[in-house]
A protein has these predicted regions:
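Juxtamembrane non-transmembrane "cap" segments at the membrane-aqueous interface
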Residues: 158-185
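Terminal transmembrane helical module of multi-pass membrane proteins
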Residues: 178-229
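Individual transmembrane alpha-helix segments
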Residues: 69-113, 195-208
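Hydrophobic secretory-pathway targeting helix
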Residues: 1-35
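Alpha-helical transmembrane segments of integral membrane proteins, especially early/N-terminal helices
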Residues: 61-81, 167-172
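Short extracytoplasmic
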Residues: 47-69
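Alpha-helical transmembrane signal-anchor/signal-peptide segments
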Residues: 27-48, 171-172
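Juxtamembrane interface at the cytosolic side of transmembrane helices
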Residues: 2-11, 114-163, 215-229
């Protein structure tokens, strides 16, 4: 009975750790100023926006600074087609208030979740015999990884089959207004976030997460098999 309880708790702890890894990798991926500049140069985005690569980099990183709590406002002045303009309109400013609140909420989930996972692991170490602790934790991580994999596969199928449905549902789930429905002609935020940039961020984030995750999964699988023998 005690072992079953610990196993369930360790699955929860593993899911919390996976969530913490996800957010940490996303945070690290986003906070790369030079990468944005190099991407704008590579895509030739300035030809479409009329804004220099330097100004676009400052503009997108101001959004990140705001989300992280390092800036009080997203607003800044940029040069667009030779004229100095305010980068963001009121809709974008109000939408980013919601985005920052969501980002900070997930940051808290990461921080408190990691602390809770550590507490659960410590508790289970005290509740189980020394000989079976590592294998039990490994089995729990493998189970949690399977749950995560199933959820990720289902999400991936949804995205592949109907991306618009996924995108709209995502925003309606986390936002209670329609500020996220922006017009390309009036919202510069959309223009400095082309599809190529978004796709590259997703790929970088996925690779950054999968590397440590797969290493942990391989280690857990090896431990579980060795202990079983």
């Amino acid at each position: 009975m005690k072992k079953a309880v610990c196993f369930t708790l360790l699955i929860i702890a593993s899911l919390l750790l996976i969530t913490a890894m996800l957010f940490t990798c996303l945070q690290f991926c986003m906070n790369q100023r030079d990468w944005y500049y190099k991407s704008y140069v590579k895509y030739g985005t300035s030809r479409e926006t009329g804004i220099s690569d330097e100004d676009m980099t400052e503009a997108i990183f101001r959004l990140i600074d705001y989300m992280e709590g390092r800036a009080d406002s997203i607003q800044l002045s940029v040069s667009e087609n030779g004229s100095v303009v305010e980068m963001y309109n009121q809709q974008e400013i109000e939408h980013m208030i919601d985005v920052r609140a969501l980002y900070q909420a997930w940051k808290n989930v990461r921080d408190y979740g990691a602390a809770a996972a550590a507490a659960i692991i410590a508790l289970c170490i005290c509740m189980t015999a020394p000989g079976g602790r590592i294998r039990l934790m490994s089995r729990a991580f493998i189970t949690a990884s399977a749950i995560f994999g199933i959820a990720l596969a289902a999400l991936g199928i949804w995205v592949a089959v109907d991306f618009n449905s996924f995108w709209n549902s995502f925003h309606r789930l986390f936002f209670t207004n329609d500020l996220w429905l922006m017009d390309y002609n009036t919202c510069r935020m959309i223009r400095i976030c082309p599809l190529q940039l978004f796709n590259d961020i997703v790929i970088r984030f996925a690779l950054m997460f999968m590397a440590p995750f797969l290493l942990l999964l391989i280690f857990a699988t090896a431990v579980a098999r060795r202990r079983q023998k």
